[in-house]
Amino acid sequence: MASSNATNSTSAASAANTNSSAFKSAELAALSGVEAAKRAAAYAAVDNHVKPQHEIIGIGSGSTVPYVVERIAQQGPAVNAKRWFVPTGFQSRELIINAGLRLGDVDSFPSIDVTIDGADEVDNALNCIKGGGACHLREKVLAEAANEFVVVADYRKNGSQLGTKWLQGVPIEVAPFAYAKVLQNLKKMGSDKAVLRMGKAKAGPVVTDNGNFCIDAPFPEAQMKDPSDLLKRIKLLTGVLEVGLFCNICKSAYFGNDDGTITIKTAAGDVQEGVHFDVSKAPATA
C-alpha cells in the first residue's frame, strides 16, 4: 500500500510539473487597457469556475472567450486529456480545435459541468442579451445544460438594465418561412423597429448555424424592465425558435475594465470592483 501511495504521489507530482512547465513555456502576449482586462477577466473566471475535476465544459463566443480557452489550455494536458469541450458555434469550435482540446457536442453531453460564454449586455440581476453573433439558440442550450453558467465580457457590456447599452434590439431566431409574420407580431407587441438582420458580406439575410433567420427587435424601456416577461411573450409567437434574452441563468459575470481591473458580479447580488488579477500566475491543476 505504501508503494502504491508513493507511486500515486510521484505521478501527481509529475503531472503538476508537466502542467507548470507547459504554462511557464507559454509566452503571454503583451496587452494593454481593456484588452488586458478582458484577458484578466477570462483567466479569473476560469480559475474560479473551471476546476480540475470538471470533465464537460461548454465554450461560448465573443471577443473575451479566446482568453478563456487560452487559460484552460494552460491547465495542461494532464488535466485536459480527460475533458470534452462543447462549442456553441463556429468560433468556439475553431478555438477548441486550434487549442488541441477534445471536441464534443451537446448530443453526446446533454449535461455540462460549466459553460463560459460572452454577452452583448448584462444587467444588475445578471440577465443577459445574447445573439449579436446569431448563435443564441445553441448558446442557450449550453447555458441551460450547465450546472454553472458564467459570463465574461468587457465593461461596455455591464449595464443596469437591458437595452441601455445594447441598442440593436433583442435577437430572435426564427424559421425562415415564418419571419414576415413574426415581424408583424413583434411590431404589434411594441417593437416598431424590428427588422430582419441582413448579412454584411453577402446579399440577403443572416443565416444562423441552424439554417434559420435572425430578427433584431428593439423594445421600449418599459418592456425591457421585465425581461423575463418579455421573453415569455416573444417565445409564444409561432415561428420563434429562440430569444436572445437569458433570464435567471447566469450565476457569475466577469467584466474587464478600461483601467485594467475587473468587476465581478454574482446572481446573489455581490459585486467586487477594481479587482486586480495576476495573469502570470499558473492556473490550478489539482
Curated annotation (Swiss-Prot):
BP term (GO), one: pentose-phosphate shunt, non-oxidative branch
Transmembrane as UniProt keyword: no
Reaction catalysis annotation: aldehydo-D-ribose 5-phosphate = D-ribulose 5-phosphate
Localization per record: Cytoplasm
EC number: 5.3.1.6
EC top class named in words: isomerase
GO cellular component terms listed in the entry, alphabetical order: cytoplasm
Keyword terms of this UniProt record: Cytoplasm, Isomerase
Family annotation (InterPro entries): NagB/RpiA_transferase-like, Ribose5P_isomerase_type_A
GO molecular function, one term: ribose-5-phosphate isomerase activity
Biological pathway: Carbohydrate degradation; pentose phosphate pathway; D-ribose 5-phosphate from D-ribulose 5-phosphate (non-oxidative stage): step 1/1
Similarity remark: Belongs to the ribose 5-phosphate isomerase family.
Protein name per UniProt: Ribose-5-phosphate isomerase
Organism: Mycosarcoma maydis (Corn smut fungus)
